[in-house]
Amino acid sequence: MKECVVWTVNLDSKKSRAEGRRIPRRFAVPNVKLHELVEACKELGLKFRAEEKKYPKSWWEEGGRVVVEKRGTKTKLMIELARKIAEIREQKREQKKDKKKKKK
């Protein structure tokens, strides 16, 4: 089983390529958190393990990584994860709107 490491920084649209972003900005999402990356892996049915590690290039920032069973190319996997994170965020936004409407 081949594995690949995906850092939260790799999917962050606020980071430049030099700072660690690995996918095109149009696919990336801002301020990715480890728990979001874990949730995306679960929803995509990937075998993974999460690690609370610091990205070496920005060791002072919060972050983490997941070691994922490789499926296709690493770039395609990261784009798939970023899209799933964006989808999860949208679902949470809609749930918050629904809760506010119910309170009124």
UniProtKB/Swiss-Prot annotation:
<comment type="similarity">
    <text>Belongs to the SRP19 family.</text>
</comment>
<dbReference type="GO" id="GO:0048500">
    <property type="term" value="C:signal recognition particle"/>
</dbReference>
<comment type="function">
    <text>Involved in targeting and insertion of nascent membrane proteins into the cytoplasmic membrane. Binds directly to 7S RNA and mediates binding of the 54 kDa subunit of the SRP.</text>
</comment>
<comment type="subunit">
    <text>Part of the signal recognition particle protein translocation system, which is composed of SRP and FtsY. Archaeal SRP consists of a 7S RNA molecule of 300 nucleotides and two protein subunits: SRP54 and SRP19.</text>
</comment>
<keyword id="KW-0694">RNA-binding</keyword>
<dbReference type="GO" id="GO:0008312">
    <property type="term" value="F:7S RNA binding"/>
</dbReference>
<protein>
    <recommendedName>
        <fullName>Signal recognition particle 19 kDa protein</fullName>
    </recommendedName>
</protein>
<keyword id="KW-0733">Signal recognition particle</keyword>
<keyword id="KW-0963">Cytoplasm</keyword>
<keyword id="KW-0687">Ribonucleoprotein</keyword>
<dbReference type="InterPro" id="IPR036521">
    <property type="entry name" value="SRP19-like_sf"/>
</dbReference>
<dbReference type="InterPro" id="IPR002778">
    <property type="entry name" value="Signal_recog_particle_SRP19"/>
</dbReference>
<dbReference type="Pfam" id="PF01922">
    <property type="entry name" value="SRP19"/>
</dbReference>
<dbReference type="GO" id="GO:0006617">
    <property type="term" value="P:SRP-dependent cotranslational protein targeting to membrane, signal sequence recognition"/>
</dbReference>
<dbReference type="InterPro" id="IPR022938">
    <property type="entry name" value="SRP19_arc-type"/>
</dbReference>
